[in-house]
């Protein structure tokens, strides 16, 4: 029961007037062949307090690499990325990888020669965030 109390407290903090949270992401809703949608014309402002993450989907096909990027809610993004995890084999034909991140323009081009991105959400954290989101929803039902 104390978990719901904590969840309600966090909900109150995030939904206070004046504390609107908005993130910018790269967005190309239709798959783009060999175009990673990372130029300025693909930058969009996501829906305030609803779409709090950026999502990137990469499909490797015989014709080339297909990209789709968008804003997403944390729940939708985490569910999609977890659902496709078994299909993600970078460098292999028909691989489908979906990743989520929560910093501005984080679904854009990869940084040159650096380690893994600190903003990328790790698989163990996916479950924690999903359960936290469910607790928040239960607190408001």
UniProtKB/Swiss-Prot annotation:
Its main location: membrane. Keywords: Cell membrane, Disulfide bond, Glycoprotein, GPI-anchor, Lipoprotein, Membrane, Signal. Disulfide bonds join 25-54, 28-37, 46-71, 77-100, 88-97, 101-106. Residues 1-20 form the signal peptide. GO terms for cellular component: membrane; plasma membrane; side of membrane; synapse. It is a lipid-anchor; GPI-anchor. Glycans are attached at residue 45. Residues 116-141 form a propeptide. Pfam families: UPAR_LY6 (PF00021). Disruption phenotype: Increased anxiety-like behaviors. Increased glutamatergic activity in response to nicotine in layer V neurons of the medial prefrontal cortex. The keyword Cell membrane applies. It is found in: Cell membrane. InterPro entries: LY6_UPA_recep-like, Snake_toxin-like_sf. Preferentially expressed in the nervous system. Expressed in embryonic and postnatal postmitotic central and peripheral neurons including subpopulations of motor neurons, sensory neurons, interneurons and neurons of the autonomous nervous system. Expressed around the growing nerves in the limb bud. Expressed at high levels in specific brain regions such as the prefrontal cortex, amygdala, hippocampus, mediodorsal thalamus, dentate gyrus and specific brainstem nuclei (at protein level). One of its GO terms (molecular function) is acetylcholine receptor inhibitor activity. Residues 25-107 form the UPAR/Ly6 domain. A lipid is attached at residue 115 (GPI-anchor amidated glycine). GO terms for biological process: acetylcholine receptor signaling pathway; behavioral fear response; negative regulation of protein localization to plasma membrane; protein localization to plasma membrane; response to nicotine; synaptic transmission, cholinergic. Interacts with CHRNA4 and nAChRs containing alpha-4:beta-2 (CHRNA4:CHRNB2) and alpha-7 (CHRNA7) subunits. Believed to act as a modulator of nicotinic acetylcholine receptors (nAChRs) activity. In vitro increases receptor desensitization and decreases affinity for ACh of alpha-4:beta-2-containing nAChRs. May play a role in the intracellular trafficking of alpha-4:beta-2 and alpha-7-containing nAChRs and may inhibit their expression at the cell surface. May be involved in the control of anxiety. This is Ly6/PLAUR domain-containing protein 1. The lineage of its organism: Eukaryota, Metazoa, Chordata, Craniata, Vertebrata.
């Amino acid at each position: 029961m104390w978990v719901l109390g904590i969840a309600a407290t966090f909900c109150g903090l995030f939904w206070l007037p004046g504390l609107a949270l908005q993130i910018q992401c790269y967005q190309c809703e239709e798959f783009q062949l060999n175009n990673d949608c990372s130029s300025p014309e693909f930058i969009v402002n996501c829906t305030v307090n609803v779409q709090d993450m950026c999502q990137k989907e990469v499909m490797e096909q015989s014709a080339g690499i297909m990209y789709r990027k968008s804003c997403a809610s944390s729940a939708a993004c985490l569910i999609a990325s977890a659902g496709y995890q078994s299909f993600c084999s970078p460098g292999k034909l028909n691989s489908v990888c979906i990743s989520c991140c929560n910093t501005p323009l984080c679904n854009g081009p990869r940084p040159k020669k650096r380690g893994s991105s600190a903003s990328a959400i790790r698989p163990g954290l996916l479950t924690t965030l999903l359960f936290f989101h469910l607790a928040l929803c239960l607190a408001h039902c």
